[in-house]
């Protein structure tokens, strides 16, 4: 058997059966070979394993005896011991050579493969080896790192060999030294992988009896024929090892590339702890998508209740609000790669069910304290033992509740030469809510008088007033809204709600980005709410059977007649004027003249809630109204219904239509804001589109769109199924939106 100690290195032959060394040294420049008495294995570079082809058996006489097997047993043993000692002496000498070559690998990350130091490692230095260059020439000088790259690719080649190969003799415990020097710059490794693959010859080696060598050499082993004391690895183990070595033990580069940043998203609500609408969903999902791209991400939200996941980190700070000192406590948890920090204070507590409760001044004081505490989180909260700091940092503020954050960043810090490398981005989710009040409210925000002009606004109806959203839009480094359509509407006098002039002046830093869907929570294939009560999980392949079963289960649960041929029309949302519930109410008599069922889920205005109850009483076999909100029922209605209505008068983005399409439910929407961006109207001529839209918030327009939808459902099943499948096939995840947010953050980072 031959032991290879490196590239083009000295090879030690020894017997394959008795594992006894011969002092003869020879140079090996071949692939895989067997001769009488010699078993030759292949070097795998990483784990230093040996193998041989199936059906090939290395048998022969002991090297301690002659060809005829003459010689005493004692002489053979003594000769073997002496030869083993010589091998160990050679290995000790080579260990010393390793120390001299450490300078050659100083640029290599020592964390690539643990275990280099402290292990008995030896391999022969070679004056002729592969060059570090990605296109090596024959005879060029070599560095240690290039040799290791070669060995790394040898291992890949070995582990991809046929499963029918039988693994040969045990590996020599020489592997730690081969492993460490493999982590390189991505460009070097990629080019080496390209050019070395065809040029490298596998080197061969064997190991002596584990009883006769030091423990530093006795590491992993493989079974060779009837050799006792070794275990043959399964093909699964070999595949796992190959996968680990192919990755080199190093993480893939972040999707963000060199633009990795510290990102802190600040929001007054964050699902699943606090939520009143889409803002909570965005705050709970966008940070996770940004973290998957390689950024260090934190969410900051008020501590409204006792959250089991978060723990008090022992940091106390005091801030002045309207002349009164208030103490805050920071709670922290880490979930899905995101640091989550809750700011606790008595004025936030016990508001879980009504987070925007209280009068105007109560809400204003809460938001002033929240923004003051949030802007200092990167200094005071050691997440994982290390604070975020103010370098390479971007804040993402959301709606008027946190629009004071970019103002405080400017007034308290950047105007005084602090946090110069920190940027702020303000996201508009709903510009109808602006934090307006009398000018006297400026005294509550604790700023000097020279910042008053940022907050002053004038409109023909209310006159001069105090406006927090206006100040945030003026001071933020970048502005984002939640869809392209809504971005266009905000620049108009009708859609900008008095702030359109500021937005038009800031057009250079303004962008629309469509929200995504949290596919972990909203995925019919894994939805936890569809695993009981007759519901079932389904995917694109099982759409028709799965949705049919969910529809029947929903009808049974709500007490409606179980009829497969009747379409279920649904509405899920807030009961108010914005959502167009009054348009649905106006269209209900027309709907009831057709063979349909209507399911509505939501809460809001008392008069609209009462109206739903009255309609259910009048049409108890066709209408079900669920006054209130239930996450479980929202999922089940989305899965079991055929059509979703969204007649919103304005809709910045909208999430329910995205959820519906993900579940194979067809949306019928008013073409405004994000609804226009996300729902492509069905075209029967080229079989394109994922739903129906109508252009004005009028009941007759809603009925016309719904009529076309019902006609397609009943008479054109093939087209209907195509609409469902196209909706489910879309990539609606947050990953696309996160990439676009990243572009905005990078632009803010380099903005001066």
Swiss-Prot record:
Pfam families according to UniProt: Glyco_trans_1_4 (PF13692), Glyco_transf_5 (PF08323)
Gene Ontology molecular-function annotations: alpha-1,4-glucan glucosyltransferase (ADP-glucose donor) activity; alpha-1,4-glucan glucosyltransferase (UDP-glucose donor) activity
Enzyme class: transferase
Gene Ontology CC, one term: amyloplast
Sites where the protein binds ADP-alpha-D-glucose: 275
Subcellular location: Plastid, Chloroplast; Plastid, Amyloplast
Pathway(s): Glycan biosynthesis; starch biosynthesis
Keyword Glycosyltransferase: yes
Name under which the protein is recorded: Granule-bound starch synthase 2, chloroplastic/amyloplastic
Keyword check for Glycosyltransferase: yes
Disulfide bond residue pairs: none
Keywords noted in UniProt: Amyloplast, Chloroplast, Glycosyltransferase, Plastid, Starch biosynthesis, Transferase, Transit peptide
Principal cellular location given in the protein's record: plastid
CDD domains reported for this sequence: GT5_Glycogen_synthase_DULL1-like
Tissue expression profile of the protein: Widely expressed.
Family: Belongs to the glycosyltransferase 1 family. Bacterial/plant glycogen synthase subfamily.
Superkingdom of origin organism: Eukaryota
Transit peptide region: 1-57
EC number: 2.4.1.21
GO BP terms in the entry: starch biosynthetic process
């Amino acid at each position: 058997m031959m032991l290879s100690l490196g590239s083009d290195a000295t090879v030690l032959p020894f017997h394959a059966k008795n594992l006894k060394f011969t002092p003869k040294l020879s140079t090996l420049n071949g692939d895989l070979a067997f001769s009488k008495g010699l078993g030759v294995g292949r070097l795998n570079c990483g784990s230093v394993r040996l193998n041989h082809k199936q059906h090939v058996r290395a048998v022969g006489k002991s090297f301690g005896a002659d060809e005829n097997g003459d010689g005493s047993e004692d002489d053979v043993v003594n000769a073997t011991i002496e030869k083993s000692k010589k091998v160990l002496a050679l290995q000790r000498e080579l260990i010393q050579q390793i120390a001299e070559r450490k300078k050659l690998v100083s640029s290599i990350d020592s964390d690539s493969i643990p275990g280099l130091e402290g292990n008995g490692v030896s391999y022969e230095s070679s004056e002729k080896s592969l060059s570090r260059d990605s296109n090596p020439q024959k005879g060029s000088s070599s560095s240690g790192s290039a040799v290791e790259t070669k060995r790394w690719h040898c291992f890949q080649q070995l582990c991809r060999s046929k499963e029918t190969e039988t693994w040969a003799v045990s590996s020599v415990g020489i592997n730690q030294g081969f492993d460490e020097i493999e982590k390189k710059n991505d460009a070097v490794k990629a080019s080496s992988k390209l050019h070395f693959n065809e040029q490298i010859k596998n080197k061969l080696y064997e190991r002596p009896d584990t009883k006769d060598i030091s423990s530093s050499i006795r590491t992993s082993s493989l079974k060779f024929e009837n050799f006792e004391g070794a275990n043959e690895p399964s093909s699964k183990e070999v595949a796992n090892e190959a996968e680990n070595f192919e990755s080199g033990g190093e993480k893939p580069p972040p999707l963000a590339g060199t633009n990795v940043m510290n990102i802190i998203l600040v929001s007054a609500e964050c699902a699943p702890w606090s939520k009143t609408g889409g803002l909570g969903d965005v705050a709970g999902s966008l940070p996770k998508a940004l973290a998957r791209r390689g950024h260090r991400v934190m969410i900051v939200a008020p501590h409204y209740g006792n959250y089991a996941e978060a723990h008090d980190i022992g940091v106390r700070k005091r801030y002045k609000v309207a002349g009164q000192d208030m103490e805050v406590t920071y709670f922290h948890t880490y979930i899905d790669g995101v640091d989550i920090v809750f700011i606790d204070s008595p004025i936030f507590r016990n508001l879980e069910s009504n987070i925007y409760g209280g009068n105007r001044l109560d809400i204003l004081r809460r938001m002033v304290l929240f923004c003051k505490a949030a802007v200092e989180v990167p200094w005071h909260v050691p997440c994982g033992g290390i604070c975020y700091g103010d370098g390479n940092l971007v804040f993402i503020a959301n709606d008027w509740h946190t629009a004071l954050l970019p103002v405080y960043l400017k007034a308290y810090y950047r105007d005084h030469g602090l946090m110069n490398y920190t940027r702020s981005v303000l996201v508009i989710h709903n510009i109808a809510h602006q934090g307006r009040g009398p000018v006297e409210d400026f005294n509550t925000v604790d700023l000097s008088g020279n910042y008053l002009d940022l907050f002053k606004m004038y409109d023909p109806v209310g006159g001069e007033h105090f406006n927090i959203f206006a100040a945030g839009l003026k001071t933020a480094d970048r502005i984002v809204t939640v869809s392209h359509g809504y971005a266009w509407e905000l620049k108009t006098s009708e859609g900008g709600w008095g702030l359109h002039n500021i937005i038009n002046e800031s057009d250079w830093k303004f962008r629309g980005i469509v929200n995504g869907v949290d596919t972990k929570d909203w995925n019919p294939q894994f939805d936890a709410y569809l695993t009981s009560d007759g519901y079932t999980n389904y995917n694109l392949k099982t759409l028709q059977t799965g949705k049919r079963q969910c529809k029947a289960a929903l009808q049974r649960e709500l007490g409606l007649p179980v009829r497969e041929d009747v379409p279920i029309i649904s509405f899920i949302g807030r009961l108010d004027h914005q959502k167009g519930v009054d348009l649905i109410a106006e269209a209900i008599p027309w709907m009831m003249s057709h063979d349909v069922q209507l399911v509505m889920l939501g809460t809001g205005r008392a008069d609209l809630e009462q109206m739903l109850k009255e309609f259910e009483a009048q049409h108890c076999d066709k209408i079900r109204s669920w006054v209130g909100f239930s996450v479980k029922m929202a999922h089940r209605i989305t899965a079991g219904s055929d059509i979703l209505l969204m007649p919103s008068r304005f809709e910045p983005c909208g999430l329910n239509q995205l959820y519906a399409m993900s579940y194979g439910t067809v949306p019928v929407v008013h073409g405004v804001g994000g609804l226009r961006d996300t729902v492509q109207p069905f075209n029967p001529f080229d079989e394109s589109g994922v739903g129906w839209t109508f252009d004005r918030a009028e009941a007759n327009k809603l009925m016309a769109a719904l009529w076309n939808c019902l006609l397609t459902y009943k008479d054109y099943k093939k087209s209907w199924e195509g609409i469902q499948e196209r909706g489910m096939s879309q990539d609606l995840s947050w990953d696309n939106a996160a990439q676009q947010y990243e572009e905005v953050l990078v632009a803010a980072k380099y903005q001066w």
